[in-house]
Design a protein with these regions (language model features):
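N-terminal, post-signal-peptide region of Sec/Tat-exported proteins
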Residues: 43-85
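Thiolate-centered catalytic microenvironments shared by cysteine-dependent enzyme domains
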Residues: 82-176, 199, 208, 259-276, ...
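Flexible, polar/low-complexity N-terminal or interdomain linker segments that lie immediately upstream
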Residues: 14-57, 140-206, 294
Length: 296
């Protein structure tokens, strides 16, 4: 009987453990020490998403460069939508990345905005079907501060044909959000003044937030030096708005779709929340629809 209980317990643990976490071979957030020890590893792609000028001044040896702006597209009036699958296939294939590649995305952390642009690229690769995608904790700022090796050699990757296995379940559109108001946990990751409607960007038609949304600012995920807070701290912060019911569906949004991938990435990839989506149209799309409710 005791042995049976043990088997039942292990079975429950297995069922509770997200399948995509099993597929990972690298952690979702890697340290500078971890990455430094793997420079030259042919199984690892270092993707530098800074502007080409910054890349040319000095980058992690072996890193390839594709600016973060190449991974988000303007569609109509919306600023930051996921690329069309054919275009994304071309972008990923051009830098020699395959579905089996392990990729560490590296950017700057001079501003919080640069940090979440880096994470958006990581989420885009996950959407395309890669499993081993990570971001460098502290970005190039921490790398340089620690006097780790730099190179000015421009790396020219060998292109390959890429066909993604697209994870459409990672994104939600406006219609889905509307249909499920009151059933899903909406997480507004903007700073409090924008969430409350005290401030708004010019590209957002109406101030305020989607009714029922909780406020979880992107900046809360980071320390003052641009590194992530500890996993334990991030879990406490996430559960302050999601509660202990991690199995409920969670949708993150922001102003234009740039920063909402940050908490999506943290909750899904690091903390193991199984049902987290991004509404990339965000308040830019929602606020422009007069039939979509907004509250302050």
């Amino acid at each position: 009987m005791k042995r049976l209980k043990i088997f039942l317990y292990l079975g429950l643990v297995f069922l509770a453990y997200p399948s995509w976490m099993e597929a990972r071979h690298i952690p979702p957030i890697v340290s500078t020490q971890w990455l430094n020890a793997r420079i030259g590893d042919p199984s690892l792609t270092i993707l530098d998403v800074r502007r080409v000028e910054a890349y040319q001044e000095g980058h992690i040896p072996g890193a390839i460069n594709v600016y973060a702006g190449a991974w988000a597209y303007k569609k109509g009036v919306l600023f930051n939508e996921i690329p069309d699958q054919a275009e994304l296939n071309e972008t990923i294939g051009a830098v020699g990345i395959s579905l089996s590649s392990a990729v560490v995305v590296v950017g700057n952390m001079d501003t919080v905005r640069e940090g979440y642009q880096t994470i958006r690229v990581a989420c885009t690769l996950l959407y395309a079907g890669l499993e081993d995608v990570a971001v460098l904790d502290g970005g190039m700022n921490k790398w340089v501060k620690e006097n780790r090796p730099l190179s000015q050699k421009v790396v020219k990757p060998i292109p390959r044909e890429f066909q993604g296995r697209y994870r459409t379940d990672l994104f939600a559109d406006k219609a889905y959000v509307k249909e499920n108001l009151g059933k899903i946990i909406l997480v507004d990751v903007r700073e409090p003044a924008y969430y409350s409607g005290e401030k708004k960007l010019d590209c957002v038609a109406r101030p305020g937030h989607i009714p029922g949304a909780y406020n979880l600012p992107t900046s809360c995920a980071f320390n003052s030096d641009g590194t992530f807070k500890t996993k334990e701290e991030l879990l406490v912060i996430a559960e302050s708005v999601t509660g202990a019911g991690r199995d409920r569906e969670i949708i993150t949004y922001c102003d234009t779709g740039q920063c909402c991938p940050t908490w999506h990435f943290i909750m899904r990839e690091l903390l193991g929340f199984p049902r987290v989506r991004i509404y990339d149209g965000s308040m830019q799309e929602w606020g422009a629809d007069e039939r979509a409710p907004v509250t302050k």
